[in-house]
């Protein structure tokens, strides 16, 4: 069954670059505890791609997910307008999905951008941030109490 593309649809050539970049980023994952490598690739409004991988720590709460690594890299270089992110893992039977913390961090930068959740065979599903985190809390909500 054909899947509807979100309104934030990304050009096919950008999607392919994102998917490849997320798979490449996964190779750099530092995950000695979970042995669950994840890679992410983030597409900015002007077409630049920032990649990231998960980085674990012996003090488990200090680890960081691939999605947040990519977003933090982009922010640290002055980018805040995002069009899409692709996420890769070694899960064979399911599409990799961002955790709740990553969904909230993505939400900080808008609700109508694409999240490509992949499998190693290259297949993917795409959802918007809004679809992954409905009824969310964002920066504009802070203005409602002033």
UniProtKB/Swiss-Prot annotation:
Keywords: Hydrolase, Metal-binding, Zinc. One of its GO terms (cellular component) is cytosol. It comes from the Eukaryota. Its cofactor is Zn(2+). The keyword Metal-binding applies. CDD domains: cytidine_deaminase. Substrate binds at residues 54-56. The active site is at 67 (proton donor). GO terms for biological process: cellular response to external biotic stimulus; CMP catabolic process; cytidine deamination; dCMP catabolic process; negative regulation of cell growth; negative regulation of nucleotide metabolic process; response to cycloheximide; UMP salvage. GO terms for molecular function: cytidine deaminase activity; deaminase activity; identical protein binding; nucleoside binding; protein homodimerization activity; zinc ion binding. Zn(2+) binds at residues 65, 99, 102. Its EC number is 3.5.4.5. InterPro entries: APOBEC/CMP_deaminase_Zn-bd, CMP_dCMP_dom, Cyt/Deoxycyt_deaminase, Cyt_deam_tetra, Cytidine_deaminase-like. Residues 13-140 form the CMP/dCMP-type deaminase domain. It is an enzyme of class 3 (hydrolase). PROSITE patterns: CYT_DCMP_DEAMINASES_1, CYT_DCMP_DEAMINASES_2. Homotetramer. This enzyme scavenges exogenous and endogenous cytidine and 2'-deoxycytidine for UMP synthesis. Belongs to the cytidine and deoxycytidylate deaminase family. This is Cytidine deaminase. It comes from Mus musculus (Mouse). The lineage of its organism: Eukaryota, Metazoa, Chordata, Craniata, Vertebrata.
